[in-house]
């Protein structure tokens, strides 16, 4: 699901929300989450999961073009850990085939 699909789904689920307001709400929420993570905070949404940062230590890498060794600095990367309810909900679909986003044979 893309951000625009999420906005459209919110607008259709809640008729009092116009598309513009749903878009504003989604953008505002994502901006707030991005700001919190960039400040090193952890985000916990009960029943859904938590977002945090993982530290990747500095290491020696290799330039694939020249083969030369390069120092790769330490960095922090976003990490998502699904909550128990989300894991159980997804696991309930364990026997079902994965849904393809593209229709097969023009269906």
Swiss-Prot record:
Residues 54-107 are annotated as: Disordered. Keywords: DNA recombination, DNA-binding, Transcription, Transcription regulation, Translation regulation. Residues 65-101 have a biased composition (Basic and acidic residues). The keyword Membrane does not apply. InterPro entries: Hist_DNA-bd (IPR000119), IHF-like_DNA-bd_dom_sf (IPR010992), IHF_beta (IPR005685). It comes from the Bacteria. GO terms for biological process: DNA recombination; regulation of DNA-templated transcription; regulation of translation. SMART domains: BHL. GO terms for cellular component: chromosome; cytosol. SUPFAM superfamilies: IHF-like DNA-binding proteins. One of its GO terms (molecular function) is DNA binding. It holds the Pfam family Bac_DNA_binding. Belongs to the bacterial histone-like protein family. This protein is one of the two subunits of integration host factor, a specific DNA-binding protein that functions in genetic recombination as well as in transcriptional and translational control. Heterodimer of an alpha and a beta chain. NCBIfam families: hip, PRK00199.1. HAMAP family: IHF_beta. This is Integration host factor subunit beta. It comes from Burkholderia thailandensis (strain ATCC 700388 / DSM 13276 / CCUG 48851 / CIP 106301 / E264).
């Amino acid at each position: 699901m893309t951000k625009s699909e999420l906005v459209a789904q919110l607008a259709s689920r809640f008729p009092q929300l116009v598309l513009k307001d749903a878009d504003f709400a989604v953008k505002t929420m994502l901006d707030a989450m991005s700001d919190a993570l960039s400040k090193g905070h952890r985000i916990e949404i009960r029943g859904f999961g938590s977002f945090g940062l993982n530290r990747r230590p500095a290491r020696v890498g290799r330039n694939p073009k020249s083969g030369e060794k390069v120092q790769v600095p330490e960095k922090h990367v976003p990490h998502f850990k699904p909550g128990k309810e989300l894991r159980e909900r997804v696991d309930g679909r364990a026997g079902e085939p994965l849904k393809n986003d593209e229709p097969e044979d023009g269906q």
